[in-house]
């Protein structure tokens, strides 16, 4: 049952790879069809800019490189990733085909050349052309050239006058580094643009291009000055696309991930500078990528102690050291004369914690100097196996074969197809230990690792040197009057503080309740010299009273108006240097330095076997300051340092915890009414707030090492969900948030625990030690006084000269429509306009009655209708005699006739004579 999930995962991966291979095959099989149709049409058919599935010329298919690889003429190699296939073109293969077979009608006026390739070995230093079109005499008409000695890329083209023109892209050393790169050139009518690894490098203007001749040949990988010699290189992808804007949409996801890079637009060449002096020693290299943790090795023998190094720069403040022993009480000094008006006294004992709203995060402190380089740690666990080395140089040329070969390999028979994979061999014996290899070159800076686990709490470290005083924070909002805190016990006498920076004027605070009179305190030492203040108003003469102890902390009043600064005090004694601090934590990343000149890439050496750890060498001189490295793993707890000497009294620290309640002192004499006290000290930090907003991106970094480009592979199907990655590094510090609204007054909390005398002594000693170096630093430079209070605003100055015209501002928002202006003057008659569009039908007009028109043509016959019967017409004239009609039918027999006797006989004789009688 345990292996069921493995079988399921295996079947899922097989189906994923099958669909990916099928999609890749279908995508590759489409291109020759497009190319075949492409050659039978015009240069580039009617296209829409922005489409990727447009006709083009696939040079790998046109030069039949895949066929040559199947015959063993060229070698198939792994491309920019494990899923990509590339071809290694050797120096003995002649890739030359007639131009008319690819570009039967020549090249279009606008197109783009794209290729993913890699140069290795001696090719990096050669001046060669990766693609070229020659005329019938072998002269170059169009080509893309790579100039190894000059570290530049050239685009050559035939001009209108027939001369060869060249556009050169200079200062590209990152292209010549034995890595996979994606080179794309966008050729337009009047300009040509170079892209390397999907980053725009430069756009150059070009002259009009002439029409090329298709009577010559197209070649790949030739020397520029001797086109008969082939140059070895590896190619993964090489099309010519009909869309000149294709490089702007191309991605570089198939290139291996490397250090992020930033390509800066090349500026105008500056004048040659004078030769500089020899530079200082180089900074230490960047740490390599951490290997995975291996098995724990046996403990090694302890190494000898190195020589003591020179004193390093002061480190950042370390963790608070162990509490020192309490010193003996000093003898009381003699009563001194009445001093002048001093600075406001230290704040009273800490009140009960309030529950205010979380304030905005304060600004980050300045980064301190790095500590001294520590001793070398024990040998680390062995890392992962390094990447495979670069391909070796080509072997010697083989002997001439005995048979005639293929036209593409005339002197050798192609090897047979690769056989099936053999069975897995037996496990070999453990080899003998190899010799120690040479030290490899400095590796690239590794990517920032994920957040490591929280280390165990280390032992108390020695006391570090106090850090630099932070910048003055912004004035907080005026808080509401809080509830009166419980009276704390009298705290220990604090030392006078150095003059603080001038704070912003706060609102006038409410008058706090008068504090109870405290017991008499001992006289403090003289403070540091303050800046000379303005003469104050004369105060009321009071009685000379005995200085009393600080009273219990009264209710905090609202900030009052800053008082005048007192006269300077006597300078203090110089303090002894404090103990050397441990190296501080990693500081914030500094601003990017000025980009240095790019050096020539060296030839990569073969990776040697991992050598044994050598003996510990003598300690070298301290190197120059290196770049901040990544945060290392938590170190082992250090040993306790020796007890340090008691330093001079330091500057006053933050208020201590409330002291234990002392015995009630005897009633003192009533003192004069005290002046308004200074604002109380800032309370302890509140609870950890929510995560702040993401900050703005940092300043633009310097030019990084270029990444390896590669061609864009086919889009794969969706992969299996990956494992959850390591937690990323914390983001950049966010901007300081807006000032929050004042919180409501908190309710009075429970009484805190009364601290012990030992705890109070520890706090005082810690504060004195933290402020010790700041006091010593101020005493070492007495010629610079503390900054004085800002003066009153001066009178307005005279108006300055008019400034230069600024850059045009951003387009403002659309303004409101203005008021209707007065009618303008009648303009001059303009030129006759163009005929307008046909207007809509107008309303019927009223015209003057016109003259009768000419008689119209007879109309068409009307539709039949029923009319009324008309009147009888007038008798007409007799008509024309008609034609004889058809004889009618025989009439009925007539009546019997009669005749007169005289006429009857004559008619009978006539009838008898007229008849043709036959017979009797």
Curated annotation (Swiss-Prot):
Intracellular or extracellular location(s): Secreted, Extracellular space, Extracellular matrix
Segments for region (Nonhelical region (N-Terminal) (NC4)): 24-266
Presence of the UniProt keyword Disulfide bond in the record: yes
Main location, first listed in the record: secreted
Keywords, in A-Z order: Collagen, Disulfide bond, Extracellular matrix, Hydroxylation, Repeat, Secreted, Signal
Segments of skewed composition (Pro residues): 269-283, 379-396, 790-802, 886-898
PTM field: Covalently linked to the telopeptides of type II collagen by lysine-derived cross-links. Prolines at the third position of the tripeptide repeating unit (G-X-Y) are hydroxylated in some or all of the chains.
Composition-biased stretches (Gly residues): 485-506
Residues of the Laminin G-like domain: 50-244
Domain (Collagen-like) ranges: 267-323, 324-355, 356-401, 414-470, 554-612, 613-642, 653-711, 712-753, 788-842
Region (Disordered): 264-462, 476-757, 782-920
Disulfide bonds: 44-242, 198-252
GO molecular function: extracellular matrix structural constituent conferring tensile strength
Function: Structural component of hyaline cartilage and vitreous of the eye.
Record PANTHER family: COLLAGEN ALPHA-1(XXIII) CHAIN-LIKE ISOFORM X2, SI:CH211-266K2.1
Domain topic, free-text comment: Each subunit is composed of three triple-helical domains interspersed with non-collagenous domains. The globular domain at the N-terminus of type IX collagen molecules represents the NC4 domain which may participate in electrostatic interactions with polyanionic glycosaminoglycans in cartilage.
Quaternary context: Heterotrimer of an alpha 1(IX), an alpha 2(IX) and an alpha 3(IX) chain.
Protein name as annotated: Collagen alpha-1(IX) chain
Organism of this sequence: Gallus gallus (Chicken)
Gene field: COL9A1
């Amino acid at each position: 049952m345990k292996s069921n999930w493995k079988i399921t995962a295996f079947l899922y991966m097989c189906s994923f790879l099958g669909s990916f291979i099928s999609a890749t095959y279908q995508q590759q099989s489409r291109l020759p069809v497009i190319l075949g149709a492409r050659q039978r049409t015009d240069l580039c058919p009617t296209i829409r800019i922005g489409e990727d599935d447009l006709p083009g010329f696939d040079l790998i298919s046109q030069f039949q490189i895949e066929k040559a690889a199947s015959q063993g003429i060229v070698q198939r190699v792994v491309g920019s990733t494990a899923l990509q296939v590339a071809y290694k073109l050797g120096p003995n293969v002649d890739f030359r085909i007639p131009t008319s077979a690819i570009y039967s009608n020549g090249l279009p006026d606008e197109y783009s050349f794209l290729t993913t390739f890699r140069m290795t070995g001696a090719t990096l230093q050669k001046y060669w052309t990766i693609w070229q079109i020659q005329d019938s005499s072998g002269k170059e008409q169009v080509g893309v050239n790579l100039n190894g000695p000059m570290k530049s890329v050239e685009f050559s083209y035939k001009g209108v006058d027939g001369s060869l023109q060249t556009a050169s892209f200079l200062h590209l050393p990152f292209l010549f580094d034995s890595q996979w790169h994606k080179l794309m050139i966008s050729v337009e009518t009047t300009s040509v643009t170079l892209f390397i690894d999907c980053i725009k490098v430069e756009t150059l203007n070009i002259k009009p291009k002439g029409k090329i001749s298709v009577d010559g040949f197209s070649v790949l990988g030739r020397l520029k000055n001797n086109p008969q010699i082939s140059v070895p290189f590896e190619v993964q992808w090489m099309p010519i696309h009909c869309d000149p804007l294709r490089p702007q949409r191309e991605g570089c996801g198939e290139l291996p991930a490397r250090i992020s890079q930033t390509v800066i637009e090349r500026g105008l060449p500056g004048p040659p500078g004078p030769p500089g002096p020899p530079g200082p020693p180089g900074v230490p290299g960047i740490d390599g990528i951490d290997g995975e943790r291996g098995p724990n090795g046996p403990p090694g023998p302890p190494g000898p102690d190195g020589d003591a190094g020179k004193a390093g720069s002061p480190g950042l403040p370390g963790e608070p050291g162990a509490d020192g022993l309490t010193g003996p009480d000093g003898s009381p000094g003699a009563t001194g004369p009445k001093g002048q008006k001093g600075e406001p006294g230290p704040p009273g004992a800490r009140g009960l914690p309030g529950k205010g709203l979380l304030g905005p995060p304060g600004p980050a402190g300045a980064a301190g100097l790095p500590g001294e380089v520590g001793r070398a740690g024990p040998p680390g666990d062995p890392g992962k196996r390094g990447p495979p080395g670069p391909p070796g140089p080509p072997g010697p040329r083989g002997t001439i074969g005995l048979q005639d070969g293929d036209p593409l390999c005339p002197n050798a028979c192609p090897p047979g197809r690769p056989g099936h994979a053999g069975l897995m061999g037996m496990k070999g014996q453990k080899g003998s230990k190899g010799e120690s290899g040479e030290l490899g070159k400095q590796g690239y800076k590794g990517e920032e690792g994920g957040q490591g686990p929280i280390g165990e709490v280390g032992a108390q470290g020695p006391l570090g040197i106090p850090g630099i005083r932070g910048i003055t924070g912004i004035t907080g909002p005026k808080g509401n009057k809080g509830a009166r805190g419980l009276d704390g016990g009298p705290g220990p006498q604090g030392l006078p503080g150095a003059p603080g920076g001038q704070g912003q004027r706060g609102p006038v605070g409410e008058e706090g309740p008068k504090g109870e009179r405290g017991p008499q305190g001992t006289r403090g030492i003289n403070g540091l010299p303050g800046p000379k203040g303005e003469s104050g108003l004369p105060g009321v003469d009071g009685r000379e009273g005995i200085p009393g102890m600080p009273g219990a902390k009264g209710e905090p009043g609202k900030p009052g108006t800053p008082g005048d600064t007192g006269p300077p005090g006597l300078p203090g004694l110089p303090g002894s240097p404090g103990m050397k601090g441990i190296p501080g934590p990693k500081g914030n990343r500094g601003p990017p330095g000025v980009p240095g000149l790019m050096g020539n890439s060296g030839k990569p050496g073969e990776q040697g076997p991992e050598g044994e750890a050598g003996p510990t060498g003598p300690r070298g001189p301290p190197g120059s300051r290196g770049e901040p490295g990544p945060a290392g793993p938590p170190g082992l707890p250090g040993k306790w340092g020796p007890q340090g000497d008691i330093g001079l009294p330091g500057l006053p620290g933050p208020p201590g915890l409330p002291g234990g309640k002392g015995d009630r002192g005897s009633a003192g004499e009533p003192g004069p009414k005290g002046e308004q006290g200074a604002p109380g000290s800032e309370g302890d930090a509140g609870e950890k707030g929510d995560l702040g907003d993401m900050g703005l991106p940092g300043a633009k970094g310097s030019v990084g090492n270029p990444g390896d480009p590669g061609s864009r592979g086919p889009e794969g199907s969706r992969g299996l969900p990956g494992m959850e990655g390591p937690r990323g590094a914390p983001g950049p510090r966010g901007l300081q948030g807006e000032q929050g609204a004042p919180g409501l007054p908190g309710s009075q909390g429970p009484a805190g625990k009364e601290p012990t005398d030992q705890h109070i002594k520890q706090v005082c000693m810690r504060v004195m030690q933290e402020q010790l170096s700041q006091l010593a630093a101020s005493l070492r430079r007495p010629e610079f006084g503390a900054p004085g209070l800002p003066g009153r605003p001066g009178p307005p100055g005279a108006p300055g000269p008019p400034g230069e015209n600024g850059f045009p501002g951003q387009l403002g928002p659309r303004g409101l429509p203005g008021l209707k202006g007065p009618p303008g003057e009648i303009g001059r008659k303009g030129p006759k306009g163009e005929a307008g569009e046909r207007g809509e039908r107008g309303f019927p007009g009223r015209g003057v009655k016109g003259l009768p028109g000419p008689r119209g043509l007879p109309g068409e016959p009307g539709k039949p209708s029923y009319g009324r019967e008309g009147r009888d017409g007038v008798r007409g004239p007799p008509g024309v005699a008609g034609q004889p009609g058809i004889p009618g039918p025989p009439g009925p027999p007539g009546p019997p006739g009669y005749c007169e006797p005289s006429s009857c006989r004559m008619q009978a004789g006539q009838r008898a004579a007229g008849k043709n009688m036959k017979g009797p």
